[in-house]
Structure formats: C-alpha cells, structure tokens
C-alpha cells in the first residue's frame, strides 16, 4: 500500500487476532528507528489489553536480550517487535503463529525464511510501502497472495511538490523561514554523506554545516545518516520527534516509515539522483498530520528525460501511478534496487502488456507443482526446470 495508507493498522489487527488464538506474534522492521517506532505505537494501541510486548534489537544490552529470550521461550511475551535480531539462532519461541515483515524488499529471502521457521505452520504477512504494479508483485512474490490498499486515510491532503532548476534554496527561503517561525519542522535530504570529488553532488555533512551556521541561534539543526551508530540515530530521531531539532539534514535513511506529524516541509537536493518511487517514499514522511505538506525538489540536471521525470512528480501523487511510470522509464531493477528485486530481465515478455499471460501462467505453474507432488504428474518437465534453474539461467527455452 501507498505511504500512510494504513498498513500498520492491518498488521495490528492480524497480530491481535493471532494473540486471541493463543499464539505469539513477531513484527520485523529493517531499522532500529522503525522497529522502535512500531513498538511505541503498538504498545499504545494494545495498552487496554493484557498483552505483553517486547522490543528486541541488536543494540540492547546482553542482560536485556536474555530476559527477552527467556520470555519468548517460556511464552510470557505475546508480541515481539525488532530487527534481524528476531531470527538469530539464540532466539526460540514457545508457539510462534504469525510473523509480519515491514518493508518486504529490504530483507533477503533467507532472512524471512529463517524467521518463518521459528514456528510450525506460521502465517506470514509482508508489507511494503513501495506500491509496485500487481504484475511486478506477482513476479517477485509469486508464492504469495497479493493485496493492495489503494485508498488514503480520510482528510489527508496531497503533498504540494515544486521542482526548481538549480541548487539554491533562495526561491523558497522566505517560505521556509515563515514555516519554521510558526513552529514547523523540516527535512533536508541529500544523496551523499560526505563530499566526493568524482560526484558534484550536495553532501549531508556540507549542507548540515551550512544550515547550522545560517540558522544558528534561531533553530536547531540535526544530522542523520547510515554511518551513525544505532544509538546515535535513535537519539537524533527522538530529538526530532520531541522538536528539540527543527531542521533534520539526512540521507535516505528516513525513507522508511519515520513518522513525525509536525514535520511538513521537505527539501531534496540533487533530486535527479533518486528514483521517483524513492522520492515519493521520502515525501511520504511529511503531511502525516492535518497540515499541508510541501516538498521542494532541487536539481541541476540538464537532460530532458530527468527534467520530465521531476515535473511528473509535481503533477502526480498516487504511488501506484508513480511506480508504474518509474518502472516503464527505469526498469524493475531500478524500482526496487538491483540486489533486492530478484527479477531477471525478461528475454521476450513485457510486464505490462503480458499481464493476462503472466496471471494465467502463474495459475498453471501452481497447478503443475500441486499435481507433481500429489500425483507425480509432469515429472520430466519439473526435473528439467530444476536443472535449468540450477545452472542459473534467467529464462527457460
């Protein structure tokens, strides 16, 4: 589902139904920041119920980890929320029944499988805010049923997005100052952490220093990026949530799930360096309350296709439309990241034009596998496919 469409509520309902059935639940998030946020929200959601909830992350002290391990093994913990720490060998569950994975494409298949194997007959719900077209979803997750939330929460306003050619904030600096003076908070997104001689791009460190100096004595500026330790990231995010920091300069580490309703303005430097779906994810961090959100895209790109793509974002804010456009102009590897997509380049097929064929083929494939294991049919064909796959072929002729 799209950014802010209510996926977490769907997960919460599933986790509660699982709890009522007497099973333990687990929710896995890709970052400690997001895991902590889920923990805080769900603890509040379930506070009226007799439900024991724990947060398990890699940065916990050994003593705290052991207490959680014991609670999971004895069954005194009903729901655990965490990062990859949830599927380590040292973690044992008494009766795990339901697993939720947030941001599906950020975890490897082996990681998801390891968590699912922590119990018998575990139900599995995976969620992603990258609203990929159904055809691509079926190709990536062909062994799962795919559901889409295509509506927005009532009353949520569209993000107003404006693209500026250049790398200066001057065109909207007055608006930014006025917004901050009214108590608002702002994200400033950069493609790099540090300056790179080979890449003439704005770095988070450089922009952080410039903004700290410019707004000194008026507003507090914070810095967030992937190279910080988890404790440092959590501290910066908490300060931003508590409005101790008014301007947060960051890389795309804030792309996933961060929720600060008071932050309703975002500036993205070198916007041409990001995929459209990635920018859509980023701007989904703002406008989460009842206030109007503003996103300013800065780019010095001179090529027309790049300009056209950024202008497209000014006019469109439906995540499914954007991802479809992104997929057509950049390809599936770019949409999800080459390492995550796991989708081979089709030698002949077209993921849009051949949707009906893809769905029909999927139905036949499921039937063939079922008949193979139940009746021994299609044995030669299945064995031939197994050999082809082992050789690493991207297609079968």
Task: Tell me what each language-model feature is.
Residues 1-311, 397:
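Inter-lobe coupling/hinge segments of SF2-like helicase ATPases
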